[in-house]
């Protein structure tokens, strides 16, 4: 036998790097893609010779910060909670020919988004609010917030309605869409982003980490190969 030292053996390769991503089945994936697809469709349908319309996508703090990763690549800015709304206002004043989208989750909407929206309406900013409503505070552990209908002690109470809050602030154009209905989302984004002023699209679908699937598996016995999977 030939003695072999540990130094002569092949080193164990490092594990491949896997960047953080949105969960498989996360409705935020669909919401981001709908806005991306809407802007692509807008530019595809422009008359020949017309300059393409550039979209600016202002992100925020939450799971949806991961919208910055490819292939979505839909977060141009991320500073702090609520900043996606206020940063879009400032940039829109300097480059008004672009279309501005401010992404904010339902939890961040209540925690830090309201003051920025009030300011946007009052100062007649031109931007599209994309409220990603998954009915929880997903990133930090699924804590309740005023839109969930449950207090921090677990008591069931009446939800604070996001649409009514927006109406009270003065947002004129508000629509709730199924975040997983791509066609509906794309058409709504195209329609709303062309309007003047502050407008809001509420992309609603539950967080995949808390929803229980209604699909049931069954065995087709005459095709079963006993694979145990």
Annotate each predicted stretch with a short phrase.
Residues 1-2, 125:
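An N-terminal assembly and electron-transfer interface module characteristic of large anaerobic redox
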Residues 3-84, 97:
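Active-site diphosphate/adenylate-binding microenvironment
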Residues 9-25, 176-194, 207-229:
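Ferredoxin-like iron-sulfur electron-transfer modules
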Residues 22-25, 34, 56-58, 101-103, ...:
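Structured core elements
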Residues 29, 35-38, 93, 123, ...:
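Generic structural signal for bulky hydrophobic/aromatic residues embedded
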Residues 50-52, 56, 170, 194-196, ...:
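A generic structural signal for short, non-catalytic loop/turn and secondary-structure boundary residues
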Residues 63, 205-208:
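Short glycine-rich anion-binding loops that position phosphate/pyrophosphate groups of nucleotides
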Residues 66-200:
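Thiamine diphosphate
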């Amino acid at each position: 036998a030939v003695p072999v030292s540990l130094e002569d053996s092949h080193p164990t390769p490092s594990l491949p790097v896997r960047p953080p991503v949105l969960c498989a089945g996360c409705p935020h994936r669909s919401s981001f893609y709908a806005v991306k697809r809407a802007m692509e469709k807008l530019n595809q349908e422009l008359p020949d010779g017309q300059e393409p319309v550039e979209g600016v996508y202002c992100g925020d703090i939450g799971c949806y910060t991961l919208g910055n990763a490819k292939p979505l690549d839909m977060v141009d800015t991320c500073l702090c909670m609520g900043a996606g709304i206020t940063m879009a206002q400032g940039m829109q004043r300097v480059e008004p020919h672009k279309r501005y989208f401010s992404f904010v989750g339902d939890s961040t909407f209540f925690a830090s988004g309201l003051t920025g929206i009030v300011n946007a309406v009052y100062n007649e900013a031109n931007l599209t609010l994309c409220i990603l409503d998954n009915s929880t505070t997903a990133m930090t552990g699924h804590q309740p917030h005023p839109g969930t209908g449950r207090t921090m002690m677990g008591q069931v109470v009446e939800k604070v309605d996001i649409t009514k809050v927006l109406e009270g602030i003065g947002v004129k154009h508000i629509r709730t869409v199924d975040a997983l209905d791509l066609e509906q989302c794309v058409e709504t984004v195209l329609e709303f982003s062309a309007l003047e002023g502050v407008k809001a699209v509420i992309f609603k679908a539950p967080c995949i980490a808390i929803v229980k699937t209604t699909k049931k598996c069954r065995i087709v016995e005459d095709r079963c190969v006993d694979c145990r999977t």
